């Protein structure tokens, strides 16, 4: 694009002035001096990484994971922490619910000796800790469990039954404004776990909403809706959950995709089972009757045995994983901003409907 000489001279002068005042890199052309690819961390589920479009959750962004009780929200975040730690990243867990089980976290592969953990007394304290960790530039992933447990100081110091209209929403709104810029500068991922509530008197549409006001919906680059869809049984014993995750909002790729996987009790996401299923679907793993084969070698009779073979042979599992990612992942392309995905907002009241 050719620019008029006088305009170009004026533009260069003002750019120089801005950089002198605010520092180099404070303003630049969009395609210049920056990485166009978003750095991501795996969620522990290959199908969810593919549904996200970029191979995982994005660094330097805010992520919200919400769903009903016991749907796998904390498990998913612990899988992300384990994946980040395997890459040598520093992680922190803000346990506002005071319910983190270190034994379970260790079973999922989390290095609990190097995981920073805080159990704050108030919501303001939790968010201040988040801000301090972010500004340090030394922490790569921060998880807050959960937004619903971030209780404002005024509510804690008041009496039960006192009205505190909009306190949590105002607190979250202020925190989002403060955190968003720092997260981008330090390339820190901030994951908020959230609970769902029912709106009273909704006749049509979805009565569900999340806690903490609307600010988080707008500032989050990715919003994941996680649900338990069924039970996994071994004879009569329930050993896990069938889980579905919907990408409700996605600023780094196309939204509204879904992923289905299994969460096994005491083990976490059944990643090897996913590799077997996706490998068969995309003809990387051959299936003849009950037998599964890879590159002509039999790897097991039945899905469970094939998965066990991949656990015992991580090099083969890694090979299939890399091949599937190369086949199914497309380069990340930013999409138009959307506040809440498939939800709508009443601009007068701020209600989600």
UniProtKB/Swiss-Prot annotation:
Q: Which InterPro entries match?
A: AAA+_ATPase (IPR003593), DNA_recomb/repair_RecA (IPR013765), DNA_recomb/repair_RecA_CS (IPR020584), P-loop_NTPase (IPR027417), RecA-like_C (IPR049261), RecA-like_N (IPR049428), RecA_ATP-bd (IPR020588), RecA_C_sf (IPR023400)
Q: What broad taxonomic lineage does this protein's source fall under?
A: Bacteria, Pseudomonadati, Pseudomonadota, Gammaproteobacteria, Alteromonadales
Any single biological process term in GO: DNA recombination
Q: What is this protein called?
A: Protein RecA
- Per UniProt, which keywords does this protein have? ATP-binding, Cytoplasm, DNA damage, DNA recombination, DNA repair, DNA-binding, Nucleotide-binding, SOS response
Annotated source species: Shewanella sediminis (strain HAW-EB3)
HAMAP family on file: RecA (MF_00268)
Query: Which amino acids does the record list as binding ATP?
Result: 67-74
Question: Do you know which Pfam families this protein is assigned to?
Answer: RecA, RecA_C
Q: Mostly located where?
A: cytoplasm
* Cellular component, GO, one term: cytosol
């Amino acid at each position: 694009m050719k620019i008029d000489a006088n305009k170009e001279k004026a533009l260069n002068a003002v750019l120089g002035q801005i950089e002198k005042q605010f520092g180099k890199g404070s303003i630049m052309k969009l395609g210049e001096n920056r990485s166009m690819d978003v750095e991501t961390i795996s969620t522990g589920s290959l199908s969810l990484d593919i549904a996200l479009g970029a191979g995982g959750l994005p660094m330097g962004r805010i992520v919200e994971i919400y769903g009903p009780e016991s749907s796998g929200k904390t498990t998913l975040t612990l899988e992300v922490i384990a994946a980040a730690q395997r890459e040598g990243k520093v992680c922190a867990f803000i346990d506002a619910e005071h319910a983190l089980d270190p034994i379970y976290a260790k079973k999922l592969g989390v290095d609990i000796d190097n995981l920073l953990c805080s159990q704050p007394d108030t919501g303001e304290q939790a968010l201040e800790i988040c801000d301090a960790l972010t500004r340090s530039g030394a922490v790569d992933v921060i998880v807050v469990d959960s937004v619903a447990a971030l209780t404002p100081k005024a509510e804690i110091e008041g009496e039960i039954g006192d009205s505190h209209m909009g306190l949590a929403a105002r607190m979250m709104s202020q925190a989002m404004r403060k955190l968003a810029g720092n997260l981008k500068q330090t390339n820190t991922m901030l994951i908020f776990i959230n609970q769902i509530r029912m709106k009273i008197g909704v006749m049509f549409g979805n009565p569900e909403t999340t806690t903490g006001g609307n600010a988080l919906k707008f500032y989050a680059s990715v919003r994941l809706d996680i649900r338990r869809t069924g039970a996994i049984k071994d004879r009569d014993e329930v050993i896990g959950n069938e889980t579905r995750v919907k990408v409700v909002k996605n600023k780094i790729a196309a939204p509204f995709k879904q992923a289905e996987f299994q969460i096994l009790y005491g083990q976490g996401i059944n990643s090897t089972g996913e590799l077997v299923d996706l490998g068969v679907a995309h003809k990387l793993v051959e299936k003849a009757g009950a037998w599964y084969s890879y590159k002509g070698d039999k790897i097991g009779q039945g899905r469970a045995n094939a998965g066990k073979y991949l656990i015992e042979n991580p090099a083969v599992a890694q090979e299939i994983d890399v091949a599937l990612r190369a086949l199914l992942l497309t380069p990340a392309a930013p999409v138009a901003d959307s506040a809440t995905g498939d939800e709508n907002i009443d601009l007068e009241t701020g209600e989600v409907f």
